[in-house]
Design a protein with these regions (language model features):
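Charged (often Lys/Glu-rich) extended helix/loop segments that serve as interaction or gating elements
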Residues: 125, 133, 139-450
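Active-site-proximal beta-alpha core segment in soluble small-molecule metabolic enzymes
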Residues: 1-102, 107-113, 124-129, 137, ...
Length: 450
């Protein structure tokens, strides 16, 4: 009111209402009685009294509410809309010319494709149903009380922005569990545990598969215990380890042929998964995957005419053990492994991570000093794409500057060390030049592997 008088204007005023209704999913607490923002019913009345005292009652034009992000259940939205519509109707009946209602955000994204409220990464409604409910609720309430229909506004940031961005990551290297060569045969001189495990592996069959699995686990545990006490040598441990994983692979293959798979065999895929090390930082590019276990659709974006033959989890290149993805969207459930192709020598292999446009780039941090990635803006028209702009990612020099390291001073110090080392004969002049060149290339280059 003071600013309006000083500026000699009649302001347009809006009030955010704290509804008792709340959303569903990860952000349910953004709404309801314990939410951070908004005025309760009694606080709204107090605010109206202040407006009247200031002579600004005709300036109240909008009410706003927000019950959370990624609302999974349409019923929660309907309940909130009914409550908000009554607030609107009551204000109109009290003589306030409110003509705008901001329904806030919350329109979710079906990340996992299940169209189900059972998953926090999905929603059980369509955009059309959401719009229909918003409009129908306020129209019906307004008609019931004989008041004007309001202008409706929504702030569906996640649903609007999630689809606009794709993260493309290249696979650098893979790691697989050791397996025993098919031609291996246990010898009489081998340790008893090796011979026992070989017999299990050699005679594995569907009828005794579960018992064989239990016996293989017991032998492995016994071998590890004996090794820790110096009673089994490294060669024996390695043979048992490799043979155990070979047994696991065959048990997994047999289990997939069963109509009813025992519970303890359902997650062998996860145990056997390859590790695909990819050129990215989870904390910079997909922070919600780490922080709140958000699911994003991930698929290979090449060799799509080939059936994937491997299953993997994704590892980033940070030194943090949390830098991995081990939950993936599949046709009808969440899987712990991603079907992928085996790598070919000297041929790049790329994975696409989709629906990352909502907040991932903004939330990303400099964990391990991995900076912003290269980015490309692409537009599509009439079925054809056009590269509009290319943005280079951050360099090592730039991220070091963020943490108060002066790159120029670092180079000077290294130059002084190289000069001194050449002078004292520790390194040759050629070695000094190469060392400085490599250092500068690293310092002024991309924070990811090139």
């Amino acid at each position: 009111a003071q600013v309006a008088r000083r500026m000699k204007v009649r302001p347009n005023i809006g009030i955010r209402i704290k509804l008792a209704s709340s959303g569903s999913g990860k952000w349910a607490e953004s709404g309801g009685d314990m939410s951070k923002f908004g005025l309760t019913a009694s606080e709204v009345l107090a605010a109206l009294e202040k407006l009247e005292k200031a002579g600004l009652q005709d300036c109240l034009r909008l009410i706003h509410f927000h019950i959370g992000s990624q609302i999974t259940k349409i019923r929660r939205i309907q309940t909130a809309l009914n409550e908000a519509a009554e607030f609107y109707a009551n204000l109109r009946k009290m003589g306030y010319n409110v003509d705008f209602v901001d329904c806030g955000g919350g329109l979710g994204v079906d990340y996992d494709g299940t169209r189900s409220s059972n998953s926090e990464s999905s929603i059980n409604y369509s955009i059309q149903e959401y719009v229909n409910d918003c409009v129908d609720t306020f129209v019906e309430t307004a008609d019931k009380y004989g008041i004007p229909h309001p202008n409706l506004i929504t702030e569906s940031g996640r649903n609007l922005s999630a689809h606009h961005s794709v993260l493309v990551i290249d696979v650098l290297e893979t790691a697989s569990l050791p397996e025993m060569p098919e031609e291996f045969e246990a010898k009489e001189s081998d340790h008893k545990l090796v011979k026992d495990l070989y017999e299990i592996w050699d005679n594995l069959n569907p009828r005794t598969m579960l018992e064989d699995w239990h016996d293989a686990e017991q032998i492995r545990e016994e071998a590890l215990e004996l090794f820790s006490h110096g009673l089994v040598d490294l060669k024996t441990r390695a043979e048992i380890e490799s043979m155990y994983w070979s047994v696991c692979h065959e048990v997994n293959t047999l289990a997939k042929q069963m109509k009813h798979v025992p519970d303890e065999l359902r997650n062998i895929d996860k145990l056997l998964a390859d590790k695909y090390f990819c050129n990215f930082s989870l904390f910079q590019s997909l922070p919600d995957s780490w922080a709140i276990d958000q699911l994003f659709p991930i698929i290979p974006i090449q060799r799509l005419n080939e059936r994937p033959t491997r299953k993997c989890t994704i590892q980033d290149i940070t030194c943090d053990s949390d830098g991995k993805i081990a939950n993936f969207v599949t046709y009808n459930h969440v899987s712990h492994v991603l079907p992928v192709h085996s790598l070919r020598s000297k041929e790049p292999y790329y994975l696409g991570v989709f629906l990352v446009g909502a907040y991932q780039e903004i939330l990303g941090d400099l964990h391990n000093l991995f900076g912003d990635t290269n980015a490309v803006h692409i537009s599509v028209k009439d079925g054809k794409y056009r590269i509009d702009q290319v943005f280079e990612g951050e360099t090592v020099e730039e991220v070091l500057d963020y943490v108060q390291y002066d790159p120029k001073k670092l180079v000077r110090h290294l130059e002084q060390w190289v000069t001194k080392s050449v002078r004292t004969g520790k390194i040759s002049l050629e070695e000094g030049k190469n060392f400085l060149s490599n250092y500068r290339n690293g310092l002024y280059g991309y924070t990811y592997l090139e």
